[in-house]
Amino acid sequence: MSDSPVTLPESIKLTEYSHGAGCGCKISPKVLSTILASQLPVFTDPNLLVGNQSRDDAAVYKLNDEIGIISTTDFFMPIVDDPFTFGRIAATNAISDIYAMGGTPIMAIAILGWPINKLPAEIAQQVVDGGRQACMEAGIMLAGGHSIDAPEPIFGLAVTGQIALSDLKQNDTAKKGDRLYLTKPIGIGILTTAQKQKKLHDEDSLIAVNAMCQLNTIGATIAKISGVNALTDVTGFGLAGHLLEMCQGANLTAKLKFDAVPLLPRALDYLALGCVPGGTHRNYDSYGEHLPELSEHQKAILCDPQTSGGLLVAVSAAAEAELIALLDANHITPICIGSLETPTTQANVVLC
């Protein structure tokens, strides 16, 4: 199957049919905490190894002493105008949660909301085909799904995966002294906002798209390194938000080398033009109290919501060389962006 975008009529731009875009649609961490607070008695299952206590990327259920099942779902509104590309990005983003736990996907089902009276069904078909393309690249079937008539376009997947329990990685199990690595550059929110504001130059139109369509398959191999102590993906809460989850879960402080954080090409140029998504401000409002004092420039980068972002890896010093060799072999530039240490201040992240 070709992954060439479908040609849309000039009058139809998917991003104009949604109030948010990609993982920037996420409900803020502060509001989400209110939603998830339950008055019901706690029901426990000893076989549920990972639930929502640590805001991890997926749930993990123990089948036996060796194998676990991973379950996750993710969906959002259009982040690009092309329907095929939108579907491909949304599916890639959902599948990557499986890799972020150290597992491999085995099947997916689609979630589709579509404004039937506003947009032709043929465009929805292209969205679903984009999802199929991502599933094919991950080696799995799009096995079914569910659709509703909705006021705005929505697409995503519920994905099932499997994992050898010895390889299971979580976001709250980092250790003091771990080094931090990021497998994709930051800046997707900035570039996609530039597109929505009609400031994105044609020659830059594929920078964010290519990053968002890259599956995090490397996660399943990273997880086999015993010295990798924690793993998560960087999505809607931005690098700072997902790093905070890692730090708070392990009671550690991150010493973040801000100047080492990799950025997508042209991200700084569009940031200078004021291309800051609303999700950036919501993110900072939600967790800024746990960060050091930041300039507006630093906020715009560290809190930039990523869609189908990369993996954040916490690796021991002893296993760092093994991780670097693996990243190099898979054409991922290994850049250490910081380390994890014993807390010395109220902030969970400090810049160095």
Swiss-Prot record:
Site (Important for catalytic activity): 26
Cofactor annotation remark: Binds 1 Mg(2+) ion per monomer.
Cofactors: Mg(2+)
InterPro entries registered for this protein in UniProt: PurM-like_C_dom (IPR010918), PurM-like_C_sf (IPR036676), PurM-like_N (IPR016188), PurM-like_N_sf (IPR036921), SelD_I (IPR023061), SPS/SelD (IPR004536)
Molecular-function annotations in GO: ATP binding; magnesium ion binding; selenide, water dikinase activity
Residue pairs linked by disulfide bridges in the UniProt entry: none
Catalytic activity: hydrogenselenide + ATP + H2O = selenophosphate + AMP + phosphate + 2 H(+)
PANTHER family in UniProt: INACTIVE SELENIDE, WATER DIKINASE-LIKE PROTEIN-RELATED (PTHR10256:SF0), SELENIDE, WATER DIKINASE (PTHR10256)
Assembly notes: Homodimer.
Function: Synthesizes selenophosphate from selenide and ATP.
Protein name: Selenide, water dikinase
Source lineage: Bacteria, Pseudomonadati, Pseudomonadota, Gammaproteobacteria, Alteromonadales
Gene that encodes it: selD
